Structures are given as C-alpha cells and as structure tokens.
Amino acid sequence: AGKYILNFGADKVRKYLTETIRRMVEDYGADYIKMDYNVDSGFVDGDFENERKAYLTWVGEMRERFENVLFEACSSGGMRMDYETLKHYSIVSTSDQVRDYLYPYIAGNVLSAALPEQAAVWSYPVSSKDVWTPSDGNVSSEKVVLNMVNAFLGRIHLASDLTKLSSENFALVKEGVEY
C-alpha cells in the first residue's frame, strides 16, 4: 500500500476537493477542518516547488471562500512548519504524540516555528500505556497535570475520553483550561 500525493496543479483535483470542502461546510455545517497532509515530501513525482505552490494556492482559495472556517494544518513531523505553509492556516497541529513525558520537548520548541495562538498542542489526560484506547486505572493526577501543562504554551486541544476521569481529575482539566 503506497502513499499518493494529489497533484493540485490539475484542475480535476482542485475541482473535486473544492466541491468536497464546499459540501463539508455548506451541507454539513463544518466550521473546523483539519488538513492532515501527513505525507513525506519525498513522494512528490516531479517539480516539488510547483506542486507545493499549487497546493498552498488552493488552501488560500478555500480560506478566502470559507472565511468563517478554521483550517488546521498537520505539522507532519515538522515538514509543514515553515512560514510559507503556516501563513495559509489558522492553526497547526504540532504533534499527535500521546506520551505525555515526551511532549514537553515538542511543546518547548514549537514556538520557534509557530505563534502560540496558532500552535495546537494536544493534551491527552486519559491514555492507556501510550496507546489511543483509554482504560480505567491508568489515569493519575500527575498524568493529567502534565498533559495540561504541556498544552499551556500553545492552543489547547483536548483529546481522549474525558468521561473516564474521576471528578478530581476532571477538576484538574477544568482548572487547566480556565488557567
């Protein structure tokens, strides 16, 4: 199973994706769209710079057309953290790292590439041994606090099943958000 990058220089691609975005916004009421373009740029077959320009031009057109929609970029391991890309997005997801003890390295350095209000820092107060599926008994107050502190440097993006939190730990999340 290979990965493919769409050629935004092709009218067919732009028309298809423009219609897809239109449907999401106008028919389904989407006001937040994450553009998870998490593909290594080495997969581009041809002129990388023109492909990139065509993609970013299209993103700019979508932001102009749907000005009330927040478009989030994926940092793709830092490959999409350049100012040319960031100026086309409201928000950039800095990482989907779920290991709370590793995120401080990302959160502490991301501001060298993105503005705090643009840098989405994910907080996973509920996790289960570093995997996506939460379980009871694996949520400590220390883990909750570290996840919230990690997110303070940017725009907090809460994730995971918060209903699994005890009332004490939920209060810590609430305090972190209010802070």
What kind of feature is each model-predicted range?
Residues 159-179:
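Non-catalytic C-terminal accessory modules of carbohydrate-active enzymes
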